[in-house]
Structure formats: C-alpha cells, structure tokens
From Swiss-Prot:
Endpoints of the signal sequence: none
InterPro entries found in the cross-reference section: ATP_synth_csu_bac/chlpt, ATP_synth_F0_csu, ATP_synth_F0_csu_DDCD_BS, ATP_synth_F0_csu_sf, ATPase_proteolipid_c-like_dom, F/V-ATP_Csub_sf
Compartments it resides in: Cell membrane
GO CC annotations on file: plasma membrane; proton-transporting ATP synthase complex; proton-transporting two-sector ATPase complex, proton-transporting domain
Described purpose of this protein according to its UniProt entry: F(1)F(0) ATP synthase produces ATP from ADP in the presence of a proton or sodium gradient. F-type ATPases consist of two structural domains, F(1) containing the extramembraneous catalytic core and F(0) containing the membrane proton channel, linked together by a central stalk and a peripheral stalk. During catalysis, ATP synthesis in the catalytic domain of F(1) is coupled via a rotary mechanism of the central stalk subunits to proton translocation. Key component of the F(0) channel; it plays a direct role in translocation across the membrane. A homomeric c-ring of between 10-14 subunits forms the central stalk rotor element with the F(1) delta and epsilon subunits.
Membrane topology note: Multi-pass membrane protein
Annotated family: Belongs to the ATPase C chain family.
Classification lineage: Bacteria, Bacillati, Bacillota, Clostridia, Eubacteriales
Known partners and oligomeric status: F-type ATPases have 2 components, F(1) - the catalytic core - and F(0) - the membrane proton channel. F(1) has five subunits: alpha(3), beta(3), gamma(1), delta(1), epsilon(1). F(0) has three main subunits: a(1), b(2) and c(10-14). The alpha and beta chains form an alternating ring which encloses part of the gamma chain. F(1) is attached to F(0) by a central stalk formed by the gamma and epsilon chains, while a peripheral stalk is formed by the delta and b chains.
Species of provenance: Clostridium botulinum (strain Eklund 17B / Type B)
Protein name according to UniProt: ATP synthase subunit c
Highest taxon of source: Bacteria
Spans through the membrane: 4-24, 48-68
Cited Pfam families: ATP-synt_C
Annotated site residues (Reversibly protonated during proton transport) in this chain: E55
Length: 71
C-alpha cells in the first residue's frame, strides 16, 4: 500500500472531527436556546459561524486528500 493513500485517508479524517464538533455545538446551542429563548438569535448566529469554520476544516482535509491522490 502506498503511503499517499494512507496520508489521504488521514486527511479525510478531518471530516470526522468536524462532524463531532458540529454535533456537540448544536446540542449545546439547543440547550442554551431552551434555557434562554430571548437570546436565540445571538446563539444561532454564533452557532452558524462556528459550524461554518468547523466545516471548513473538513473541506480543507478533503481537498488535501484529492491533491495527494492525484499527484
């Protein structure tokens, strides 16, 4: 097995971390909105920004995996 394939597989694992992080953040945001419904818009804004940043790391990992495999 080529080391490039292993490296690409490891790069794709960033999606796993992003998925776990977004799941935890969404759960906590839901709890926070349930406790303080009047702050829902601020919590939702922070959640969307954080989820976007977390998802960006997964996309970067996928791009790097494609770059490694097509080299």
């Amino acid at each position: 097995m080529n080391l490039a394939v292993i490296g690409a597989g490891i790069a794709v694992l960033t999606g796993l971390g992003a998925g776990i992080g977004i799941g935890i953040a969404t759960g906590r945001a839901t709890e926070a909105i349930a406790r303080q419904p009047e702050a829902a818009s601020k919590i939702q804004t922070a959640l969307i920004i954080g989820a976007g940043l977390a998802e960006a790391t997964a996309i970067y990992g996928l791009i790097i995996a494609f770059m490694i495999l097509t080299k």
